[in-house]
Swiss-Prot record:
This is Deoxyribose-phosphate aldolase. The keyword tRNA processing does not apply. It is found in: Cytoplasm. The active site is at D92, K155, K184. One of its GO terms (biological process) is 2-deoxyribose 1-phosphate catabolic process. Keywords: Cytoplasm, Lyase, Schiff base. HAMAP family: DeoC_type1. Gene3D superfamilies: Aldolase class I. GO terms for cellular component: cytoplasm. Its main location: cytoplasm. The keyword Ubl conjugation does not apply. It comes from Clostridium perfringens (strain 13 / Type A). Catalyzes a reversible aldol reaction between acetaldehyde and D-glyceraldehyde 3-phosphate to generate 2-deoxy-D-ribose 5-phosphate. Belongs to the DeoC/FbaB aldolase family. DeoC type 1 subfamily.
Amino acid sequence: MDKQQLAKMIDHTILKPEADKASIEKLCKEALEYNFASVCINPTNVELAAKLLKGSEVKVCTVIGFPLGANTMEVKAFETKDAIAKGADEVDMVINIGRLKDKDYEYVEKDIKAVVDAADKKALTKVIIETCLLTEEEKVKACELAKKAGADFVKTSTGFSTGGATPEDIKLMRETVGPEMGVKASGGVRSIEDAEAVIKNGATRIGASASIAICEGKVSDSTY
């Protein structure tokens, strides 16, 4: 896989709360230079990114119910519609982790479906399951519910919890959802070796702030 092909699999990400206008402008400039799949940013930065990336192939990705997933499904649905209206092409939503652990699967599925329905095929939907907080059984169940709810992707992590993507989790997620859905590895992918390991195990997208280091064959100390 060459640098260009790898770049097209990366969501160039900045989700830290202190990200200012200059940070978003820099992120978008880099995304255009490397032709990354998207920029992944917080909802308040969607309008600016959409303006900066207009006419390019780089998509605008934002996050919903982030990073805890503890908002109500009504709030997540509103966030989704609002983000799309402001220019988002992709939305990465966080599941309600507590409800999953309660085995309230009906709630978890409805929560995901609220975002899928709000997106109304106008934006790709990615479901963050926060693998570091789940048992193997819970990871499988979360992926099954995301698939049942009609989401486009499952995603490992927010990058704000206790761990990120591992090749083992990617393999399990890919085996669970099958070949039709996307699988996004995020959190802790900091080098070309990390990227190759998750791709080998079934990742079709990578979320990283270390995107340039990955493409240039370097190693970043970034946490996302």
